[in-house]
């Protein structure tokens, strides 16, 4: 039972087999469906607590019918809005008092949506919501220097074989990688000079740790 973690099912393409497996072992107290994410929820037999978006993909009428049957809350917006549907879902998660959100359907479709979701993770983090984006091959989250809980990587707990760190800020200062196949000591990296320095690292032993002094990193745990 994950009391302070909600699930956001976004509208991007979702590997149904993976999603079914993912939600099977996790009990979320609150589920937010984002537009076409409603179709995924429907297939998985997940009843959302809230459906958010303009429903230009899922269809407003279809959404209204389903809502009558299942009785969840909705937050409907016009398509000409300034925020993406996932952004609206993040705001809803914060309003509902959650500190962590697992997000499905945020990757693998339109690249503009995928990149905006990664930028959204930063705004969400600043507002107090830690987002973890999952798909069949990746777990993505952001790291700041004070994230002690997320800076230790246990080999039998990570999502896949590889751990990559990409700078989200222009520079990230003082990176030390301990227990990784490719270690670093107090290294400053920048998007311009080292865009791929910390990609595809591995953990040969039981655990590894990252520390750094300043900046924000995108962490991707991935499997082939």
Residue map of PLM features:
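N-terminal beta-strand-loop-alpha-helix module at the start
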Residues: 2-65
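Mobile, glycine- and charge-enriched loop segments
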Residues: 2-7, 30, 63-78, 205-224
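General beta-strand structural signal in soluble alpha/beta enzymes
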Residues: 9, 32-35, 53, 75-76, ...
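Short glycine/serine/threonine-rich phosphate/pyrophosphate-binding segments
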Residues: 16-18, 83-87, 110-115
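A glycine-rich helix N-cap at a beta->alpha junction
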Residues: 69-78, 128-132, 158-164, 172
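Short phosphate-binding loop-to-helix
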Residues: 73-96
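Anionic-ligand-binding alpha/beta catalytic cores of soluble enzymes and soluble regulatory domains
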Residues: 102-149
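Long, charged alpha-helical interface segments
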Residues: 138, 143-224
